[in-house]
């Protein structure tokens, strides 16, 4: 089983403009698509498409639209209840092939919501499983959360991968070599942060 943790999930909205994006201008949208997002959810969707057993874990308020989208796609998931809504990330596609991204920070999680997320993750995995910790951390989650989770999961015999950046990546590096994940997926920019 592969379990993904998306600590800061999103609704990814992509709008395509009929022309060039001009700051301060009025623009017409030629298409508007919203889908589930967050690195861990994207990983889980890819794993499911490959026909492998996967479970996506993420925080979301009861009735959040993200849950409905994942239900509609048939992706196995467990969400931990939160008081805030899932963030929306906006991508604006305009001529001549330019993409502008605007990302919300996400709703802050309380210490009890962070603890519930950890509990769901650790109870979902068994020795020999793979856990993928992916993406940014929601506000309220300590920067060293992934580093802590690596140790907790590896102590249970779980293989752990991490795909993150900025402060969580630096905290992971600071915990190495004892708290090093089994695999790490940095891009060129993230490698430069180390």
Segments predicted by a language model, with ranges:
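Conserved N-terminal subdomain of the carbohydrate kinase-like
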Residues: 23, 48-130
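Glycine-rich phosphate/adenosyl-contacting loop at the front of the ribokinase-like
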Residues: 1-55
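Conserved beta-alpha-beta core of the PfkB/ribokinase-like small-molecule kinase fold
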Residues: 130-194
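Structural motif
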Residues: 1-3, 100, 129-130, 183
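Residues at the starts of beta-strands that form the adenosine-phosphate
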Residues: 1, 53-55, 76, 158-159, ...
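Cofactor-binding loop segments of dinucleotide-utilizing enzymes, especially the Rossmann-like FAD-
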Residues: 5-9, 59-61, 82, 136, ...
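Short, acidic Gly/Pro/Ser/Thr-rich loop/turn segments
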Residues: 10-12, 97-100, 138, 191
